[in-house]
Amino acid sequence: MKAEVLIYAYLAVCAAMIGFNIACIFVFRVKDKRLDHYSRRFIKIVHQVIEDQTVTEEHCKYLSKKLKKINNLMAFDKALEELFPQNPKQTKDYIRQLSSVFIYLTLEYKKKSEIQAAYFPYIIKKYKIFQGQPIGIVMDILLELVHSPSLYVRENALQVIYSIGSVECTMNALWILNE
């Protein structure tokens, strides 16, 4: 009798795991569709701004508001990935003009969870947003992220610091890691 109870318990656990996996599949499909929808919206907006060749203050405010949410930042990243092969020079110019937006977002993502805080420096590094221009407040926040207990946050923050090219900030980051 005890063996039968154990088998039924094992069967119930297996059924629960299968149910959980099926539910996850549906949830991830919905999230992927939502991400694609947001990405298409960003593609239209960014493509229009690139064609006009001017980033307006209104557009910067819109992005500052929208990109505070991690799902919108992921959709924006996906949109830029699609636009880069089509117009590499114009897209780079567009991203350079958004440095004020990314300075603001640096302050916002500093307050977020570790996973979100790790993703934001990845975006900065990926598109080389602050390359060659070490901005004080951004560098201070990146150095704070180097203190993080999360390996992903530290790694991405260090990669951004290295890509910016500031010797002083790189040395400070190495001192922080050494402690």
Model-identified regions with their sequence ranges:
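Residue-level detector of extended alpha-helical repeat arrays and alpha-solenoid scaffolds
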Residues: 39, 73-76, 117, 154, ...
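Acidic, Ser/Thr-rich low-complexity segments on the non-lumenal side of membrane proteins
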Residues: 51-81
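Core helices of alpha-solenoid repeat scaffolds
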Residues: 97-103, 135-139, 170
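Short inter-helical turns and helix N-cap capping residues of alpha-solenoid HEAT/ARM repeat scaffolds
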Residues: 112-113, 149-151, 179
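N-terminal signal-anchor transmembrane alpha helix of single-pass membrane proteins
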Residues: 1-40
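Structural detector for internal amphipathic alpha-helices that build alpha-solenoid repeat scaffolds
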Residues: 78, 86-96, 118-130, 155-166
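Buried hydrophobic core positions in alpha-solenoid tandem helical repeats
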Residues: 104-107, 141-143, 172-176
